[in-house]
Amino acid sequence: MDFVAGAIGGVCGVAVGYPLDTVKVKIQTEAKYTSIWHCVRDTYRQERLWGFYRGLSLPVCTVSLVSSVSFGTYHHCLAHICRFRYGSTDVKPTKADITLSGCASGLVRVFLTSPTEVAKVRLQTQAQSQTQQRRPSASWTSVAPALCPAPTACLEPRPKYSGPLHCLVTVAREEGLRGLYKGSSALLLREGHSFATYFLSYAVLSEWLTPAGQSQPDVLGVLVAGGCAGVLAWAVATPMDVIKSRLQADGQGQQRYRGLLHCVVTSVREEGPRVLFKGLALNCCRAFPVNMVVFVAYEAVLRLTQGLLT
């Protein structure tokens, strides 16, 4: 049931957090945005409400599978570790056991999420690249009337990607399989230690928030533990998340980065060390409500099925 509960929790979470995820990606990949509000205002002015939901269909279709694998892998890995170390799955796992299982859960996710992350980032940043292409130079404007009676129509390029599936097919055709796994090195580093932090912090906070005489926290305890676990996980994940987003968005036009280290060095040299924490506040603001919903849905499904089976 961990797989089913994880799937339901993941879908609920993505429904809550996707608009803020779009803003986060734009802030991380476009240097022109000076603040969260600047990005929100600019996105709404150019694309209206739909601009915050670009590329949503693919995450909604795949997040149930990914979340299911994450929670299922964590649970089964933890059970195998306890059985191997202590001879029984009923023994309370140590923090090291939880950390290792969480890390394994994060690493497994990468093989499923990398292609969808590439498509999501390309679609989320596509509108900005189109806007830059439409912006004419002074010299072009001076001759435009003679060449084209309707400059606006001539300057409106069609989007390169018409949707998530078209984006995946286009990337695979133009860049090969490596294109679908672009940024996966940064994604591995992000997911490994962030999911170790995620599950460890949730387990510790749940234990602290469990009322005396009970074996598990109430709904309020789950809300607080889940939200805080999400915030802590994104706090450690943000530097690699910035690099991941830049590497994955780099497939559009001339490529700037040769790899993970080159991206880190170039980004820090051009924008300073603070660039690695671009979107941190937004990540944390998004993580709290999203992971509150994820863990409440996850725990609700588990407790419901346990009640029906007993």
From Swiss-Prot:
UniProt name for this protein: Solute carrier family 25 member 47
Keyword list, A-Z: Membrane, Mitochondrion, Mitochondrion inner membrane, Mitochondrion outer membrane, Repeat, Transmembrane, Transmembrane helix, Transport
InterPro entries: Mit_carrier, Mitochondrial_Carrier, Mitochondrial_sb/sol_carrier, Mt_carrier_dom_sf
Organism for this UniProt entry: Rattus norvegicus
One of the record's GO molecular function terms: transmembrane transporter activity
Solcar repeat windows: 1-80, 93-208, 217-304
UniProt membrane topology term: Multi-pass membrane protein
Keyword Cytoplasm (UniProt): no
Family as reported in the entry's similarity comment: Belongs to the mitochondrial carrier (TC 2.A.29) family.
Keyword Cell cycle: no
Transmembrane segments: 3-23, 49-69, 98-116, 192-212, 219-239, 275-295
